[in-house]
């Protein structure tokens, strides 16, 4: 895909949704961090359903840590990999409480040092909370980038590296949100909705439905 097409696609998505919002519910930096950790291999719907109850009981590093591992597991048991996630959350809560004075760190190195926080999670936190022009590549973003030929790659790392190079700076802040929403509701894994796609004419997917 050429530079002009990419710019047109992003312009269309920008006009349609100037201020895209993440679909995870949160009211603090720490709540978002926990929600993103929980969202790995899960859906935002399940995470929101879970945190709606959990955050009424505990929603700070101190209260989560005091809740304890077993009680936390009970609250998040409907989420995939809940045993591992519970342990990571307890450990991360303790580190943020004791090392960072209950404040979520705002740089990649410190974020990725937290249990349960990888590059994708760090990118989301940096982007949403701290307005950094990072691009998180999840399954939706990966699929849309490859399918449309916006930025092809065999893995998320390659796609992210390409996106950093080809996405104009003015669009980088919202890129992740636009593409994840497009992948979640339009360019879905199954039953692709080409008939209502805003970027249909610019898409280079050879099997798109006319």
UniProtKB/Swiss-Prot annotation:
Iron-sulfur keyword on record: yes
One Pfam assignment: HhH-GPD
Assigned keywords, A-Z: 4Fe-4S, DNA damage, DNA repair, DNA-binding, Glycosidase, Hydrolase, Iron, Iron-sulfur, Lyase, Metal-binding
UniProt GO molecular function: 4 iron, 4 sulfur cluster binding; class I DNA-(apurinic or apyrimidinic site) endonuclease activity; DNA binding; DNA N-glycosylase activity; metal ion binding
SMART domains: ENDO3c
UniProt cross-references to PROSITE patterns, sorted A to Z: ENDONUCLEASE_III_2
Cofactor note: Binds 1 [4Fe-4S] cluster.
Cofactors demanded by this protein: [4Fe-4S] cluster
GO BP, sorted A to Z: base-excision repair, AP site formation
Protein name per Swiss-Prot or TrEMBL: Endonuclease III
Species assigned in the record: Buchnera aphidicola subsp. Acyrthosiphon pisum (strain APS)
Gene: nth
């Amino acid at each position: 895909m050429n530079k002009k097409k990419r710019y047109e696609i992003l312009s269309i998505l920008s006009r349609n949704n100037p201020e895209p919002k993440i679909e995870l519910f949160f009211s603090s930096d720490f709540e978002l961090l926990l929600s993103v950790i929980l969202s790995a291999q899960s859906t935002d719907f399940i995470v929101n359903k879970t945190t709606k109850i959990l955050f009424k009981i505990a929603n700070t590093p101190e209260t989560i840590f005091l809740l304890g591992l077993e009680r936390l597991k009970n609250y998040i048991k409907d989420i995939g990999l809940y045993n591992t996630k519970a342990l990571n959350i307890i450990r991360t809560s303790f580190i943020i409480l004791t090392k960072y004075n209950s404040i979520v760190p705002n740089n990649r190195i410190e974020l990725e040092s937290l249990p349960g926080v990888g590059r994708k999670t760090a990118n989301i936190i940096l982007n949403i909370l701290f307005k950094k022009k990072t691009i998180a590549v999840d399954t939706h973003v990966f699929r849309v980038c490859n399918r449309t030929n916006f930025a092809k790659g065999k893995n998320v790392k390659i796609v992210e590296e390409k996106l950093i190079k080809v996405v104009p700076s003015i669009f980088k802040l919202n890129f992740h949100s636009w593409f994840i929403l497009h992948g979640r509701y339009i360019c879905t894994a199954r039953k692709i909705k080409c008939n209502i796609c805003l970027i249909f004419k610019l898409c280079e997917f050879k099997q798109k439905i006319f």
